Amino acid sequence: MSEILCQWLNQELKVSRTVSPKSFAKTFSNGYLIGEVLFKFELQSDFSEFSESRVSTAKLNNFSRLQPTLHLLGVQFDQNVAQSIITEKPGAATKLLYQLYIALQKKKKTGLTGLEIQTMQPQTNQRLQALKSEAFRERLKNLIPRQTDFNLMRVTCRFQEKCKQMKEDLARMHFEKFEKIQKLEEEQRHFNIEKQRLNRRRQNEIMAKIQAAIIQIPKPEPNRTLKAIEAQKLMKKKKEAEDVANEIKKFEALIKKDLQTRESISKTSLDTIDQTAAELLNTYSDDDYIKKIQKRLEEDAFAREQREKRRRRLLMDQLIAHEAQEEAYREEQLIHRLMRQSQQERRIAVQLMHVRHEKEVLWQNRIFREKQFEERRLKDFQDALDREAALTKQAKIDFAEQTLRAKEIHEKIAMERAQQRYEKHYGICAEILDQILDLCTKVADYRLLTNNLIPHKMMRDWKELFFSGNPIYEQTSHTHGQTESTEDHHVELNKRNLLDSKDYEDYKNMTGEWALPEDMANSSPPSNNNILGHVLLRLIENSYPSEKEVADTELPSFAVKGCLLGKTLSGKTTILKALQNDIPIQVLSIDTLVQEAIQAFNDGEKSSKAPSMHEDVKGDPEVDQKEMIIPQDKNELTDTQVPGEAAPQKEGTKSSDFEQFRPSNSFLSLSMRAQLGAKSELMLRRGKSVPDVLLVNILVNAIKKIPVNQSWVLDGFPMTVNQAKLLEEALTGYKRKSLQLKKKKAQMPTLALSPTTSKEVPFLPSAFDFAILLDISDNSSLARINDIIAKEISHEISHENVSGPTITSSEEKSEDRNLRDHIQHRIVGFLDNWPLLEEWFTEPRNILKKVNAEIDEAFLCQKIKEIFATEVSNKKIKVEKKLEEKETEKKSAVSPTEPPTPTPPLASEAEKEKEVHQAKPSGKGKTQSVSPKGKAQGGKISVKKSPIDSTEVSPTLIAMPTTKPGSEEWVYVTEPIPEELPSFLVPYWELIEKTYISHIKTVLRQLRESQHTVLSYLYETRTSFQEFLRRPDHKQDFVSQWQADFNSVPEDLWEDEETKAELHQRVNDLRDRLWDICEARKEEAEQERLDIINESWLQDYIGITMNHFFSLMQAEVNRFQDTKRLLQDYYRAMESRIPLEDNKKFTRIPLVQLDGKEISEHQLRIPLVPRISSSPENVSMRPKVKALLKGRFDPPLESLEANFEGDEKIVLDTWQQASLAISQMVAAEVHQRLAEEEKEQPQLDPKEKSPQSGTNKKAKKEKEQAKKEKEQAKKEKEQAKKEKEPPKKKMAEKKGKGKSSPVVEVSPVTITPEEMAEMERKNELKLKIKEEHLAALQTEEQATQFRLELIKSKALSILEDLVTKVIEVYRFMEKWLGKRYLNEMASIQKLTEVARYHIETATKIQNEIYLSQEDFYINGDIKVFPDPPPPTRPPPVEKEENGTLTIEQLDNLRDQFLDMAPKGIIGNKAFTDILLDLVTLNLGTNNLSSSWMHLTQLDLQEITSLLTVNTEFVDWRKFLMVAAMPWPIPLEEELLETLQRFKATDEAQTGTITFEQYKQAGLWFSGDEDIKIPENPLEPLPFNRQEHLIEFFFRLFADSEKDPPQLDYTQMLLYFACHPDTLEGVYRALSVAVGTHIFRQVETPMLTAEKTSISSVSPNEEFPEAEENSTREELKEEKDERDQKEEEIPENANTEKISMETLLKVFGGGNEVLDANRFASYLKTENIYSENLIKTFQDLGAKNLEPIEVNILLKHPYIQDLITNYVDYKIPDIKMILQRSEHAQGSDGERSPSRLTDEKK
């Protein structure tokens, strides 16, 4: 039944789902297919409301709609049946479908529809059915569970099934586990059983062997003779006797144990027991005891005999049998004992034989096992060889991969380093570029400020900032209240200091801005004050005396010191080993030294003299200060608890790993090397690297142990600059010496240079004589480590099965592996540190030598040896030269010790003081604080003088030196000075220099910044005045109002003369008003200019600038005063005179008072003068100012000129005042010198007369001298002051000493020649000091005067330049004002002319007239009244061209043909009649073009024949397509591309598209033509024919009956496949139908019949020759193309399949169409080729007409003939007929309508 229903549903009804018997209930459970079945029988009208879903709501909906229909058919259906079907109850759906099948078959027989059946039902039944349906729906809703409940139930069921499945899996797992356990137990039980079986079998075999070894001896028969019986009795008695003896032994043993408690039982041996018991008993010695035993034995024997008697009597028979048994047993025992020995021997023999057999088996087994061992060894050896080969191969692969990985890592690191270098270089370049841009923008800004004339000084400052790398623009403005300093502020301070230093250098050297002006070009700048420089240098050297140089008693060493550096594996150690073998040098490797130090600590190496920590460890200040304790045992290092180690370390404190050490006797007793090793081991145990300080200490300690004359070389050390510095400091102490050198250089004077070079610190020797770099590339280093590892791997693999390597080789391997792991880091570390190291070794003196280490090892060793030999020879030459210098120094030191004149021996200290008092007058006596040198030199003077000699010496004192002081030949006075004098004068000179430089820099900075202020002020003045001139005015308002009034005049009044006169008057009024505005603005501008000129800025700025230059003059004057005082104190101290009292009232240069306020004198710190010159002479005006003011009269500028002249006078007065003050100072100093000499001159006479009166009159002379000095001091000073206490005290002391000195008894002595020479020398010295002092003052005066004159010239030039710039700006302001006024007046004149022109021409002014500021123009962009609207352009109109039908005509023809024949096929006679009617009845209709109006009936018939399909019908669509030409004929490729676009647009693949889709896809040509828009707006646009043709083609081929119209694009493209060549057209149509290009199989000849027919119809004389030739050329080209295509046919061409329907669509021209009238509602079509095509398909093997390949189809003769003769795809040439008709009409004249009517009839 189910199969029948399935067949009915699937085949007859063809339901949407395939129904199978297995899924029948499930398929119909939702009721959808039941509704579909009813719908197919037109019973379920609401089938669209059915749902295919399986949810509860869908099922309820479906079955609720099914219930009325099933009830109508009489099928039994209620909620129970529905529930059964929904729940997929077996048989429910089948039963319902069977009932439905029967009911539908009945209905089918009746032929009634559902509506008819329903109408046949009574009305009451229908209402009742509606109620039943509603009730059914409610009941069914209650029966069917909700979808959510159903979903929950399904989820529950799913999880229940999952739970059940998990339980089953768990039970299965337990069962499997239990079975596994049972299986294991069973296997164990079987194993135990088998084991027991094997054991039993082995035991049975052993028992069998034993049994087989037993020899069975036959038992002899019992001997029943008396002799045998007696022997048995005897044996029984012996046995009893033995038993008794044994019992007795036991008893005696017990007795002995009781008697001898805790004693050892002595070994006793009893003699062999006799055969009888009596003999045994008699052996005991105790008689009583023996008697008792004998008695007891007798009693026992008697009792036993009685018992035996009774037993014999009672049991005689049993006794006899028992005795017999006993006898038999005894005999057996006896025999057994006798035979036991032989059995044991046989058993031993059997066992021996068994052992021999076992030995033989073991021997055979051993031989077999040895053979197996031999085979195994051979196999293992072969396996080892194979494994070694495999491991070697794998190791090579791994090593190659590792090498490649290491190379990639190295390349990556190199790329990163290159990237870092690039980024650094890029950053530097970017910074430089930014600074260049800043400089350019700064220059551009200041070109705007200065009118492209940037001051030279400003440009120099910017260049200086640019070259120094400082930003040109200001970074921040640091106000006075701001306290915190930022980075930008530091940058600004650095910039300011740089520019200040540059300005000071220019000022000092008189370069740049401070170069000599033209008026001072003839005067040379002052030279350096050599005397002052010498004085300062001597003071500095005395204030910081140089340390005494200790003479080296030892000879300099010939040892060469160097270091060998390079990358890892560059060959340093190898080269040094080879060098050490050939040359006696000591090689020091830091790694070896650290290991030896650690080993020394572990070995507890003791020091021989126990040095202290502070003496030995010099390079480690931390270790010197921190105490440490280290136990001797190395294991105690980790266990020792360091105090405070766990406490957190505070920030800012310097942590040191040696803080935990404390001094201990055990540690201090260690050697220095051991102590350093302890610290190194501690650092290494903590996982840290050994510090550089510790490494250097270890290295220095090792160097100290090397002999002095032995050379040494360091292996790979130092590695960083820090290590190099520490090593240099430890070996040479360069840091301390360099600091001394810097300190001494910092104290050298800068204002006065010494003529002689100061004693510099000698050149600091380096710690090394040479440093060699083994240069090697990174790749070579990596290649060497790879070679080492490769050799190591091969060695390991080859010796893997041999005994393990030694400890040394394992350590080397670990070192190599460690080196390989860190080779990249080492290379990178070397590359990072080497640039600084290279700079360290090459900066002071180049000791670095680079050697290429990638050469051969022997050649490299030879090269290093040559370098070392060269260094040894150089060192030898240096040492010999040094020795020669020392010898020469010793000789030169010995020669000056012998003076040319004899000197008296040195006296004692008391005698020295005495001589000093006698030789020196009280006014110039020396104090006690004179240096020893001074005392020694003063002590050389003798007190013994004669008056005669003194008179002879006096003429020699007047002699003058020939050399000039300060020159190169001048010998400077170096008399001793007091020790405390340099400590006062050196700081005083430093203060002078510091104050002078600071003052000069501050003033120059103010002048520099004021220059920027001037430029900014002048620029702001110019711009503000220009903006003032450009301020807005109200002229445009008046102009706009006038224009509005002018345009508002009516047009009819334009020609009136009175109106014109009125308009001219209005123009005049406007002009006058505008002139008034311009005059007012001019006056305001002039007042603004006067306000700017009358500002006090220029006067204030000139005053400030003058004060700056006066400050410079003050600085020079102050410096001169301070220098004069310093020289005075120095030379007076050298003459042992008392310094003069300090005069604090220095010369002050007054400044200019800027404002006119009067200030009281006590409020002034600096004197001020008014802006009025005190000099009466006139100062001539500068030429620049005079040139600017020449020929012009401007009162404000004249006032500026007068002010400038007064300022010049003030500058000159101030300069003269400063110059005069300096000259007066020098004159006063010279006068003071002369006065002192005059005072000293009279004192020479008393000394020469008699030295005796010196002791008595000494005090009086001292008092007189003091009074004279006091009066002289009062004259020189302005304020009277009392004498200071120190001079009084000194005089009192000298007076006291003079009184208390012992009176020497003097006799008249004549003056010796030596005393005369000493007096001459003293006078010469005084004269030399005076000359030197005055020369220094004069030189300083000249320099100061020159500086003051330079400042004066600079001040005047700057003031002149400033006034010139300001006057120039004021002149420009006047020029701008006048120019603007003239431009405004010219603009007003132009406006007046334009207005008068428009008045005279009587035209309005449409464009806006613009008059603003000084500009006048007519704005063409703005119109005051709108233009008239432009005329509208007419729509485009298509014109007839060359007889072509217009789009409108084509649409009219289409509408007529569509009404006549909607399917496109029309009879040829009807077609001809329609055309004839259109031609003859075209009066006023314009249905055809003019060229068609000349066609005759014959011509129309010829056109019809060209379009005829089957001699009866015409395709009017093809006619319209041809009539619409010209249009681009598509190529085959274009047709296929258009087809693909249509198919892509047709998503549903229905074969039809709408107009929107058609427009979206487009044809092979587009309607976007280049249309030229005509310039004339009244001319219509050109007509776009192609765009309209595309739309017309859609209307032509679309099915207009559908809404919206649908276009069959394949059918349309078949129309366009037509071609002038018939064969080409057919192939094009096939290609369009198939969708791909179809190649021609065979070449078919051209259809000549058609040509002949056409030629016969149209004679040659009717065709133009040009067209005929062009047609032939086109056909020839097409033929060539076709031939070329045929030649290019690929092998697998035309493999596409084509169906019968497609083929019939292509050859559809054979359809027989009946379309007799326009009212036919359908057409009857039949293709005449269908039968032949079906037969062709069957012939080709397609029995069921399935698609076949095109190439197979084209080979069939019928298809070839059909393609050759099918002419429907040829484009008919209608144009030829039209041209012929026009030609004939031109010869015959126009036809009349009557004639046409006759022809029609």
From Swiss-Prot:
SUPFAM superfamilies: P-loop containing nucleoside triphosphate hydrolases. Residues 176-260, 321-395, 722-748, 869-895, 1051-1077, 1252-1286, 1665-1695 form a coiled coil. Residues 1-105 form the Calponin-homology (CH) domain. Residues 632-659, 883-949, 1233-1304, 1651-1695, 1781-1801 are annotated as: Disordered. Pfam families: ADK (PF00406), CH_2 (PF06294), SPEF2_C (PF24082), SPEF2_D5 (PF22946). It is found in: Cell projection, Cilium, Flagellum; Cytoplasm; Golgi apparatus. It comes from the Eukaryota. Residues 883-892, 909-918, 1233-1250, 1261-1295, 1669-1687 have a biased composition (Basic and acidic residues). InterPro entries: CH_2, CH_dom, CH_dom_sf, P-loop_NTPase, SPEF2_C, SPEF2_D5, Sperm_flagellar-bone_growth. Signal peptide: none annotated. GO terms for cellular component: cytoplasm; extracellular region; Golgi apparatus; manchette; sperm flagellum; sperm midpiece. Interacts (via C-terminus) with IFT20. Interacts with DYNC1I2. This is Sperm flagellar protein 2. It comes from Rattus norvegicus (Rat).
